[in-house]
């Protein structure tokens, strides 16, 4: 149980292991600026939503609430493509221009083994890492026949069933995993569900009231989601391994009350193949090759809204995207250092169009026009990184060069291309056996995506519909110059870590909601902040854990026609704290607390609003039995608070008017029970 985790904290003091969350694992080689989240598929997470899980575990990550599932994250005040997210080394992108299907939504927590979060521009292996990277590793097949079955039920009609089985031989190992879940519209602390929150927002405003849910849809479920994953690992020889995997995600009828459309479905398919060979020569300790492909199909529409029923027709925005990539990487020992170098390439296609469909089928589907016109983003990059120790000093460094071309099928916008170089240096000094000092400096880049460059909206009040380009084909790529500094201290019964960062953003891509067209602009900006985290083993049975994050963001240059210098998405001071009590070797109780300060530094001209601070208490208890059964009971938001974590949506729903954006409240008191049987 947890006691083994607590005792390992004592070992950390002498072994100088890296920071771990949940299932603490000793790892001297992990860099100090890396966090690893373990046990994501276990007792810590009660739904498939990875974004919610990360928000609960990492103080520097905040949740962007959009729905009951498929939510998004910010990392150190940045979001969207500024965060590089990979799943088993493969990159998947959402198809929705409104971020209804962010990368975190295409992997479910049930399938995850661990997650590595690296903050800052220190990952040269990946294309476009600006504020940090999130690397998800899914479960691996085992030789021994093993598996688990899990049933979960909770408030607001939540139901989930999942299962995994694995086994094989000395040469071949297989894994099959599946899950299905559904949930009703959750209620906030006031007792209002999605439909009621939306009706409260639109009350007295006929221009927005037409986007309320229709009478026959106002009580529909918030989502259903199914996942299938299969893996085959083959040891060709003692030094050669082949890994194949396929994952399918199928989500249906996902409600997004703060947007004008809901997702009819969201389907994704990911295929991944890896081959590695060890000890090829003195120049190759390990050679790794990978090819992958991901596809996403995402139609969203006004089908469930009042204006569809009244007008007898609904609008659909159907988008697709696919990502193909390959990487070749070689690792070697040279000059007393661990080095690796390689090349990677990727091609993303993004396409979308608007159509109108009559509910009774009396007329053929009418195409209004393209939103994204078959845009290809091709990238090739080369990278080099190395790690070397000089006594008590460990140095890591990396270099990367990228060449990117972006081609659109539209004859009204121009193609574009970018080249960039990235570099980073990170040093860790062991001042004594209990103290680490660390500092890093880095530069990274990310190119604008097809939405930011070329996205088109249509004014359907005019006949024919008027084409308005929401994107900006003249955007430059963004460059991040960042400095990170910190200290980590170990004590006989615990650990304390402090770090601070300063990020200088040149040509930061920012949404200006005041403009009638070309809403994305380049500005210069800066973000700085600090993080404090610690663990303490009070007794053999009581364990305390806490983390705090603060950041501030300012515009160095202003957006066109605006005067507010506060950056959007800079969430306020956030505190996580928990105390866990092991009442015996097979059971524990945990009380946790999340507190967030008032959100007062806002970009009001782009839809942000002042939000009250809040404090939320969560309680859970788990019990393991000798027969392989584990029961987990919990209550989130124990005091049934009404609160909001997410501020602006104006850039997510592409609004270009002066109206306020609707804010979605978080769930009220949520009671859940999970039963897992492992064999």
What are these language model-derived features?
Residues 62-63, 91-119:
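Short acidic/polar hinge/loop motifs at secondary-structure boundaries
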Residues 106-148, 678:
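A beta-strand signature from Gram-negative outer-membrane beta-barrel systems
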Residues 388-395, 404, 495, 500-505, ...:
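Gram-negative outer-membrane beta-barrel transporters
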Residues 225, 239-286, 295-321:
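Flexible loop and strand-edge segments within Gram-negative outer membrane beta-barrel domains
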Residues 155-182, 193-252, 267-273, 277-278, ...:
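Transmembrane beta-barrel wall of Gram-negative outer-membrane proteins
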Residues 250-252, 294-299, 356, 362, ...:
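Surface-exposed extracellular loop regions of Gram-negative outer-membrane beta-barrel proteins
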């Amino acid at each position: 149980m947890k006691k083994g985790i607590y005792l390992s904290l004592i070992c950390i003091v002498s072994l100088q292991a890296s920071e771990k969350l949940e299932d603490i694992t000793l790892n001297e080689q992990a860099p100090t600026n890396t966090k690893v989240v373990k046990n994501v598929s276990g007792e810590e997470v009660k739904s498939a939503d990875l974004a919610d899980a990360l928000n609960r575990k990492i103080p520097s990550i905040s949740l962007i609430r959009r729905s009951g599932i498929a939510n998004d994250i910010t990392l150190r005040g940045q979001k969207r493509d500024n965060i590089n997210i990979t799943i088993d080394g493969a990159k998947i992108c959402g198809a929705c221009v409104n971020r209804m299907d962010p990368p975190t939504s295409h992997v479910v927590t049930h399938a995850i083994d661990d997650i590595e979060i690296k903050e800052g521009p220190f990952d040269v292996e990946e294309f476009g890492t600006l504020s940090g990277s999130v690397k998800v590793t899914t479960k691996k097949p085992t030789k021994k026949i093993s598996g688990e079955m899990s049933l979960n039920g909770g408030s607001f009609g939540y139901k989930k069933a999942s299962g995994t089985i694995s086994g094989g031989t000395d040469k071949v190992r297989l894994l099959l995993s599946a899950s299905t879940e559904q949930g009703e519209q959750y209620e906030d602390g006031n007792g209002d569900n999605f439909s009621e929150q939306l009706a409260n927002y639109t009350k007295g405003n006929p221009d927005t009231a037409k986007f309320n849910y229709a009478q026959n849809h106002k009580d529909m479920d918030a989502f259903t989601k199914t996942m299938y994953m299969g893996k085959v690992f083959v040891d060709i020889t003692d030094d050669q391994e082949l890994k194949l995997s396929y994952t399918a995600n199928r989500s249906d009828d996902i409600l997004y009350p703060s947007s004008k459309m809901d997702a009819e479905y969201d389907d994704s398919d990911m295929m991944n193949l890896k081959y590695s060979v060890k000890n090829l020569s003195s120049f190759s300790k390990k050679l790794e090759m990978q090819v992958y492909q991901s596809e996403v199909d995402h139609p969203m529409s006004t089908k469930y809204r009042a204006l569809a029923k009244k007008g007898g027709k609904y609008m659909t925005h159907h988008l697709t995207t696919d990502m193909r990539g390959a990487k070749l990487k070689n690792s070697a020992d040279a000059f007393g250092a661990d080095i690796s170098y390689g090349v990677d390439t990727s091609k993303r296609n993004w396409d979308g169009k608007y159509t109108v469909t009559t509910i009774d089928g009396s007329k053929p589907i009418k195409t209004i026009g393209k939103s994204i016109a078959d845009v290809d983003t091709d990238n090739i990059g080369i990278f080099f990184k190395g790690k070397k120790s000089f006594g008590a000093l460990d140095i890591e460094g990396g270099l990367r060069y990228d060449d990117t071309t972006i081609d659109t099928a539209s004859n009204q916008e121009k193609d574009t291309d970018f080249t960039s170089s990235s570099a980073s240096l990170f040093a860790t000094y062991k001042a004594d056996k209990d103290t680490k000092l660390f500092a890093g400096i880095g530069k990274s880049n990310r190119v604008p995506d097809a939405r930011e460059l070329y996205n088109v909206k249509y004014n359907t009040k005019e006949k024919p519909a008027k084409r308005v380009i929401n994107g900006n084909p003249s955007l430059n790529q963004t460059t991040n110059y960042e400095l990170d500094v910190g200290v980590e201290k170990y004590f006989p019964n615990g650990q304390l870590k402090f770090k601070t960062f300063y990020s200088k953003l040149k040509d930061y891509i920012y949404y200006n909601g005041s403009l009638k067209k070309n809403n994305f602009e380049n500005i210069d900006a800066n973000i700085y902040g600090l993080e404090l985290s610690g663990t303490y083993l009070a007794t053999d049975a009581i364990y305390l854990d806490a983390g705090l994050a603060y950041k501030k963001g300012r515009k160095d240059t202003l957006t066109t026609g605006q005067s507010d210098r506060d950056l959007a998405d800079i969430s306020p001071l956030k505190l996580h704290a928990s105390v866990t009590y092991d009442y015996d070797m097979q059971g524990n109780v945990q009380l946790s607390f999340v507190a967030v300060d008032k959100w007062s530094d806002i970009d009001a001209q782009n839809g942000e609003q002042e939000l009250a601070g809040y404090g939320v208490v969560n309680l859970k208890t788990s019990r393991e039995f000798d027969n392989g059964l584990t029961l987990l009971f919990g209550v989130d938001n124990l005091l049934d608070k009404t609160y909001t974590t997410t501020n602006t949506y104006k850039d997510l729903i592409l609004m270009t008017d002066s109206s306020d954006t609707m804010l979605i409240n978080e769930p009220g008191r949520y009671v859940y029970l999970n039963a897992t049987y492992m064999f």
